[in-house]
Amino acid sequence: MKALVKQKAEPGLWLMDVPEPEYGPTDVLIKVLRTGICGTDLHIRAYDGWAQQAVTTPLILGHEFVGEVAAIGSDVADIATGDLVSGEGHLVCGKCRNCLAGRRHLCRSTVGLGVGRDGAFAEYVVLPASNVWVHRVPVDLDIAAIFDPFGNAVHTALSFPLVGEDVLITGAGPIGIMAAAVARHAGARNVVITDVSEARLALARKVGVSLALNVADRTIADGQRELGLREGFDIGLEMSGRPEAMREMVANMTHGGRIAMLGLPAEEFAVDWARIVTSMITVKGIYGREMYETWYAMSVLLEGGLDLAPVITGRYGYRDFEAAFDDAASGLGGKIILDWTV
């Protein structure tokens, strides 16, 4: 089969012929239809400092995908050949305290698909049946391919009740934009998103944010005044990992405000902890998706009319992966899709 492989410990990816993966009695063999390119994949392609520590070559990368079940193991139930499926990219041990308590997203032994084991940038991928999500209702293939990052957005956005709340989102990357769409759909009063990229702020406007604010030119306080917010934001969703974004978020929260933080900082940084304490602000770290409450929520949101189409800005055949990765790395668009059927 064809696969995109990190063949060498150096920058680049290689489209190669590799053996089809074998599957065991509790596994599912999936014919990949479409995949999404993630920031993690860009790091692996560039072979930066993180990738050098995290990845062992050779490796088939990729963890955002949709596919059709090609075969199932002898012990697999409730999944059938021909089912349309996506996959949870965090593989857990199933034996630790958190896993046994049903908190699998908190497993201390999580292995990442396409990082710690061969992934989905290939014609076929194998996953444990427990990591396979069957789409029981019709879903657009491009959207099904990005259920992994969509899940990050949903997990973050729905960390706190949103109805009637004023929400600040720092970082208008694809996940930030999806989180904005979710917050709007879930009943937030005002949704403000910030970035320094006009191209991405334009995408955010397409999902119905109240204000898309370029913080290179204006401050968050300016945005508050424009919307008539006198007491600050109720909910903060930090998606950028930028120290200045987190500091500005803390400075613009109301007393008792709640912050969900998905953005991963590159290094340690200082924040105004005195303000967090005296304003009684809650800060919650978010990583991945809750298994499988987040997946259920994603499906229900889409059934209820949530429109993520503006987030998809590029589609390429898998043989054009270099152009697709360049597009994704430009930082100018949304999600980029690779089609494995052409």
Curated annotation (Swiss-Prot):
Active site: T40, H43
Keyword presence, Electron transport: no
Species this chain originates from: Streptomyces griseus subsp. griseus (strain JCM 4626 / CBS 651.72 / NBRC 13350 / KCC S-0626 / ISP 5235)
Subunit structure: Homotetramer.
Record key words, sorted: Cytoplasm, Metal-binding, NAD, Oxidoreductase, Zinc
Names of the cofactor(s): Zn(2+)
Pathway as given in its UniProt record: Amino-acid degradation; L-threonine degradation via oxydo-reductase pathway; glycine from L-threonine: step 1/2
Family statement: Belongs to the zinc-containing alcohol dehydrogenase family.
Gene: tdh
EC number of the protein: 1.1.1.103
GO molecular function annotation: L-threonine 3-dehydrogenase activity; zinc ion binding
GO cellular component assignments: cytoplasm
EC main group: oxidoreductase
Stated name of the protein: L-threonine 3-dehydrogenase
Localization per record: Cytoplasm
GO biological process annotation, one example: L-threonine catabolic process to glycine
Positions of Zn(2+) 2 binding: C93, C96, C99, C107
Task performed by this protein: Catalyzes the NAD(+)-dependent oxidation of L-threonine to 2-amino-3-ketobutyrate.
Cofactor: how and how many bound: Binds 2 Zn(2+) ions per subunit.
Binding site for NAD(+): I175, D195, R200, L262, G263, L264, I286, Y287
Pfam families in the cross-refs: ADH_N, ADH_zinc_N
Highest taxon listed in the record's lineage: Bacteria
